[in-house]
Amino acid sequence: MIAHVVLLQPRPDLTEGQRRAALETLTSAAAHVPEIRSFRLGRRVTHGLPGYEQAMKQDYEFALIIEVDDVSALKRYLQAPAHRALGDLFSSATAAALAYDYDMT
């Protein structure tokens, strides 16, 4: 299983409604990509423990965790037209992002 992990910070000028719409579009589009086995979207939780949150160099408000079967499925997903369309939306709605892929087997 490969986890495609994306941390993202929406653009500061987006309203809450625009943020919600962009996230809903990402979620609904993911349902139509056959390689995706699991799609999870979450908002960052802060807890106030001294030193922990302050150690983070960059704030990312949301995380996407997308699971696919293997590296071949990941490549198909990343090269698919649906991913390119999502990338366009993603680029227009985010101020900062990180994406990494991990083998979870």
Please provide the spans of the model-predicted regions:
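C-terminal structural segments of small proteins and small subunits
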Residues: I65-A97
